[in-house]
Amino acid sequence: MTNAQRADSAGMPLDVNVLIGPYPYRYVPHPDPDVLVRVLAREGLRGAWVGHLPSAFYRDPTPGNAALFAALEPHRAVLAPAPCIRPDWPRWERALRDAVEQGAVAIRAYPPQWGMGPHDRSLQALAAAIGEIRSILLLTVRFEDLRQRGNLDVAGDLDAATIRATVRSAPNTRVVVTAAGREMIEQVHWGLTPDERARLWWDISWIWGPPDDHLAHLFRTLGAERFVYGTQWPMRLTQTPRANLDLLPDDLRDARLADAGEIELR
């Protein structure tokens, strides 16, 4: 059995970080749910939490959420919606309830795109509300490397201070952070209490494997159980996380990621 298969007790991981829809700053090929279903089958993944890529850049994400639910309806056995809720927008509380009633598996938020910093009260209110309804807050550090971004994309990366403050502000909320690298993960992890760390997971879509071996280092220092499987398709290659797991050193051959399905049930 490979390390990639050990990522999940069933041998088929669940991808917490995929997106559908166009990207506003460059062409992204085939970001469609029917293509995604075939990609998941090819990669041996049992399903995915799916966000709507353009909604991150809408002032009002409501139409994007409607488009997400409609697009995923034929594929709900495999694709679970993860809509975004903007907490400084009118009637966001109702939008959150509606999303959960429609089967949202997690709620995405995009603080950099919405101009929200570490002490933004609306972001903290959203985090607390997500905890109250027993859902999961999903944050995204970045969509592209800074060196790739177009001049119109002026939002920076999600910073460590905002992640820490958000986790601290909502003691009943589970948080999954996607697209973070080793430095960001360490800045956040070592700045939290053990109880706070226990409610926080990281996907592995942006963590380097060999020769830097950042993934192996993080498994040894934080524990593999703090990480979940994520690819950030279609922005990144779906094969990269699996390859990085397969290339883990021998001393980590029994390392096992947290299962996103189990996080849902906590």
Briefly describe each language-model feature range:
Residues 33-40, 65-72, 96, 123, ...:
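Generic structural signal for well-ordered alpha-helices
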Residues 17-23, 140, 179:
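Histidine-centered divalent metal-coordination motifs
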Residues 106, 119-228:
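Catalytic pocket-lining loop regions of alpha/beta-barrel enzymes
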Residues 17, 40, 68, 72, ...:
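Conserved, mostly hydrophobic/aromatic
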Residues 46, 59-145:
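Active-site gating/metal-coordination segments in enzymes
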Residues 1-18, 25, 30-47, 97, ...:
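Mid-to-C-terminal alpha-helical segments outside catalytic/metal-binding sites
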Residues 24-31, 55-63, 85-93, 114-121, ...:
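Acidic-and-aromatic substrate-binding clefts and catalytic sites of carbohydrate-active enzymes
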